[in-house]
A protein has these predicted regions:
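Conserved S-adenosyl-L-methionine
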Residues: 175-232
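Non-catalytic, mostly N-terminal accessory regions of nucleic-acid modification and defense proteins
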Residues: 1-196
Length: 232
């Protein structure tokens, strides 16, 4: 599912005047994927809190959540085309309101180790390059189809993101310098022999390839207990 969606997104961005390279395709799809994933994560946390009878404070204000500006839904769960922005309205909202709001988290955060600060840092460094709001609407609708609930889906996303980084390198852009092939990662994990309960640190985490392969290595060990699985 992810592979075809990524291809569809790249085809749309290829037609946009503001996106001229593999680097642009990766960057522009990444910030949308980030916001979609963040929205799903907040939804899961809110549901968990509700089951425990606890309140949950959303990081993102209502007007800037995914289901408000990107993909408002009808009562049946389908995209509400009457409420969804498109064209110049969508592009102008993203450029003039969404990005400044998200970048502002860097100043509003309580410290550099908070997720709020990291959101602000990300959106202080990038900008929306998609010039056509209609192209942006099409890309958003493809991103909205993605789901990140299962571990296998997260691993597939990691693999495909690494492939995009590799393509950046093949196209002569410096982003590919930081791509580590999966076979090499697997070999390094096997040599290091991580154990459940140990802290696994990837100091240069990009697509989380090392972390994903460490998880695969640990989860494939024989005789795992319930406590081990909970730790994983």
């Amino acid at each position: 599912m992810f592979e075809q969606t990524f291809k569809n997104i790249d085809d749309i961005l290829h037609k946009d005047a503001g996106c001229t390279s593999e680097l642009d395709y990766t960057e522009q799809s990444s910030w949308l994927l980030f916001l979609k994933y963040l929205d799903a994560l907040e939804g899961d946390k809110a549901n968990e809190a509700a089951l425990e009878g606890k309140p949950y404070r959303f990081i993102i204000d209502p007007a800037y959540r995914w289901d408000a500006w990107a993909a408002p839904k009808t009562a049946s769960g389908t995209l509400d085309h009457n409420a969804a922005m498109t064209g110049d309205d969508l592009r102008d909202f993203v450029n003039a309101k969404l990005f400044p709001y998200l970048a502002g988290f860097k100043q509003r955060a309580s410290g550099p180790n908070t997720i709020e600060y990291k959101i602000g840092e990300v959106f202080s460094e990038i900008k929306n390059k998609v010039q056509s709001g209609y192209n942006l609407r099409d890309v958003i609708e493809h991103v909205d189809e993605l789901r990140f609930g299962a571990q296998a889906e997260k691993h597939e996303l990691s693999h495909l993101y690494e492939a995009k980084i590799k393509n950046m390198g093949n196209a002569g852009r410096n982003g590919g310098e930081y791509y580590t092939p999966r076979p090499l990662i697997r070999s390094m994990v096997k040599v290091s022999k991580p154990r459940i309960g140990e802290r696994i640190y990837d100091g240069a985490c990009g697509s989380a390839g090392f972390l994903c392969e460490a998880f695969e290595y640990l989860s494939s060990q024989p005789g795992l207990s319930t406590a081990d699985l909970k730790t994983l």
